Design a protein with these regions (language model features):
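Membrane-embedded alpha-helical bundles of multi-pass integral membrane proteins
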Residues: 1-55, 60-61
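Iron-sulfur-cluster electron-transfer modules
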Residues: 66-75, 97-103, 110-306, 310-311, ...
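The canonical Cys-X-X-Cys-His
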Residues: 78-84, 88, 141, 145
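Short, flexible loop segments at boundaries between secondary-structure elements
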Residues: 314-343
């Protein structure tokens, strides 16, 4: 009822003084980092059954009538301070996306008495397609917002509608989706080549074809980039060599790996994500069996987030470690020796948003 009153009185942005407390309380990822798992796809407040969706299920956020009560609360809580915009990488690289203006446009459209179209995105709608696809889903806007508006949730839900209902998405994504379906990676590379980097190592790397042997402590999830992309392969081989030097017993899945589904999910293709996630979860179950603690080490931040957070929505949880965490532990335990030296070049560490 606060939202109803707010839409009919003239206090405008001042309503955040009252609504912000409720918005913070009902934040989806309460007490968690801004960039967590993406929201499940809901229809009428319930998760969509992807194996047998109902005829009247709504896929994503397409019209102002699809906006949830939490969405309206987000929009009416906006202080218009612009902190989200000031941290947005898309905005700083001259893309048309401003998280602040997007939330304001959605709010004005939702509260308007008369509109040219009910749609949220497209011709005569408040949000242009280019705006929607400029988002990197990094979560900086959510992290910076003083009233915990969840911009990324709304953007991804609108993408879901555009992909699954309207089939309106950048042409480049069409190829990516096909490659993920057919080859299990974004580039359409041969699945057999996932083990190519192993042949370039001068030490043994165990590839498991069934259940993980008891003596193996860690499953090293290589990921698509780590297996195919030349620069990322250097990281994969370096991490594997360091684990070998430290005496860590690890194994990889090799060609049993397939993409986690992160590119599909963040691009709005929730159906494809669910297929890839289900396939990987079955592989994990076969690999870990009845093991209590299931340790997975990754180099890719996207794999780290998707497997560690998004897969948990399906009820399957793993103990995820980024390779930097494990290497740090090995150094502290004395299993890896470092030899400090003065670098003759400047080194920049990219701390990924994921």
């Amino acid at each position: 009822w606060f939202i109803v009153i707010a839409s009919n009185l003239t206090m405008g942005v001042a309503w955040h003084r009252f609504l912000a407390f409720f918005n913070i309380y009902y934040k989806r990822n309460i007490d968690k980092p801004a960039l967590g798992a993406l929201p499940e796809m809901l229809s009428k407040g319930k998760p969509v059954n992807f194996e047998d969706p109902a005829e009247d299920d709504v896929f994503g956020l397409g019209t102002r009538g699809d906006i949830s009560w939490k969405g309206l609360l987000d929009m009416t809580s906006c202080t218009e301070c612009g902190r989200c915009q000031s941290q947005c990488p898309a905005w700083h690289t001259d893309k048309p996306l401003s998280p602040k203006l997007l939330i304001m446009a959605m709010r004005d459209h939702a509260m308007a008495k008369v509109v040219e179209t009910e749609n949220l995105v497209g011709d005569k709608a408040p949000i242009d397609l280019d705006v929607l696809w400029s988002c990197t889903s990094c979560g900086a806007c959510v992290e910076e917002c003083p009233v915990d508006i969840e911009h990324v949730d709304h953007i991804v839900n609108m993408r879901r509608f555009q992909v699954l209902v309207e089939s309106e998405f950048p042409t480049e994504l069409g190829g990516t989706f096909r490659n993920l379906e057919k080859s299990g990676n974004p580039w359409g590379a041969n699945k057999q080549d996932r083990e190519g980097w192993i042949a370039e190592c001068d030490f043994p790397v165990r590839v498991v074809s069934g259940e993980l042997p008891e003596e193996v402590e860690y499953l090293f999830w290589v990921g698509c980039a780590g297996a195919y992309e030349e620069r990322a392969k250097k990281t994969t081989k370096a991490v594997a060599e360091l684990l070998h030097m430290a005496g860590v017993n690890f194994a990889v899945l090799g060609k049993r790996e397939t993409c986690t589904g992160d590119p599909a999910r963040r691009s709005g293709n929730e159906f494809l994500y669910q297929i890839l996630a289900a396939e990987n979860i079955e592989t994990f179950k076969e690999t870990f069996g009845n093991r209590g603690v299931k340790k997975v080490v990754v180099t890719c931040p996207h794999c780290f987030t998707t497997i560690g957070k998004d897969y948990a929505q399906s009820g399957y949880e793993l103990q995820m470690l980024h390779h930097t965490q494990l290497l740090n532990t090995l150094v502290k335990e004395g299993k890896l020796k470092t030899s400090p030296h003065k670098a003759d070049q400047k080194i920049t560490f990219h701390d990924p948003c994921y």
